[in-house]
Every structure is written in structure tokens, then in C-alpha cells.
A protein has these predicted regions:
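Short beta-strand/loop segments at the ligand-binding rim of alpha/beta enzyme cores
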Residues: 8-10, 65, 125-128
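Boundary/entry segment of secreted carbohydrate-active catalytic domains
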Residues: 1-43
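Short, well-structured secondary-structure segments
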Residues: 11, 34-48, 56-76, 95-97
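Broad hydrophobic/π-residue packing in well-ordered secondary structure
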Residues: 19-20, 26-27, 36, 51-56, ...
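Acidic (Asp/Glu)-rich catalytic clusters
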Residues: 4-5, 23-33, 51-64, 82-93
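Surface-exposed substrate-engagement region within the catalytic domains
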Residues: 31-36, 80-132
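Extracytoplasmic/secreted cell-surface and envelope-processing proteins
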Residues: 23-24, 46-50, 76-79, 104-110
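A cross-domain feature marking catalytic cores of carbohydrate-active enzymes
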Residues: 16-18, 41, 68-72, 98-102, ...
Length: 132
């Protein structure tokens, strides 16, 4: 079966989290035209995606660009910002992204989401990505 990304053509970006099972062959994905990974780093004020750090290392080793996202919830925006920035370890090439979507446990409101984004932008001096 032909992978969808081989039909669409490069450059392509894939979204990963701990919900995507291993093994993931980043070299094979790169050969198929995937040039960037956006990976969940954190959620809320305490969850850390256990696959973030090892997959970051493997994706970069395969020659891909790498970006981190934070799955926002209704907990404290300042707490979420602090948590995300501590875990994501955003280097100068990364902007960070905030994922805002319905969450059965704790959906962030638009006002809170805008405040969270503004806090990250102010702290880093760059504009983070809005991801939904």
C-alpha cells in the first residue's frame, strides 16, 4: 500500500506523540519526503510526553527539522508556559507551538489560550505557532 505522504510530495511534516506506536523509522520517513516532525512535549501543567526527547534526537539524526508542541488545557496558563518551556528545551531554531483543541477532561478557553501564547511569546521574544 502506498503511503499518503508519497503521493502528496515533499516537503512534509508529521505530528507525533506518545500515542503513535514504535518503531518509527525516521530515516525511511525522510527518504519518503518527510522533512519535519512536530512532537508533543507536554500537556497541561505536569504531563511530559515520554517519547519527546528520544524521538527528537532520532529525528534530528535523520536530518529532519524538529518542533515541539504543548497540548493546552484549562489549568493555569502561567503554569503551562513554565512547564512547556522547561521540558521542550526550545533551541534557536524552534518556535514552539500551542495545540488548542477540545479535551474531554479540561478544554482551554480562547482567552486563556491567547494569554498562554502571549506569555510564551513575551518570555522567548519570538512568536510561537498556533496549532489546532
Amino acid at each position: 500500500m502506498t503511503a499518503l505522504w508519497t503521493v502528496l510530495g515533499p516537503p512534509l511534516v508529521i505530528d507525533l506523540s506518545h500515542n503513535n506506536p514504535e518503531p518509527i523509522d525516521f530515516a525511511a520517513l525522510y527518504a519518503d519526503g518527510v522533512r519535519m516532525v512536530i512532537h508533543k512535549a507536554t500537556q497541561g501543567s505536569s504531563f511530559v510526553d515520554p517519547m519527546y526527547a528520544p524521538r527528537r534526537k532520532r529525528a534530528l539524526a535523520a536530518g529532519m527539522k524538529f518542533e515541539a508542541y504543548h497540548f493546552a488545557d484549562a489549568s493555569s496558563p502561567v503554569g503551562q508556559m513554565t512547564h512547556f518551556l522547561a521540558v521542550a528545551n526550545l533551541d534557536g531554531k524552534m518556535r514552539g507551538a500551542i495545540d488548542v483543541e477540545p479535551n474531554h477532561n479540561s478544554t482551554i478557553g480562547f482567552g486563556q489560550a491567547n494569554f498562554l501564547v502571549s506569555q510564551i511569546d513575551q518570555k522567548r521574544g519570538t512568536q510561537c505557532l498556533r496549532y489546532t
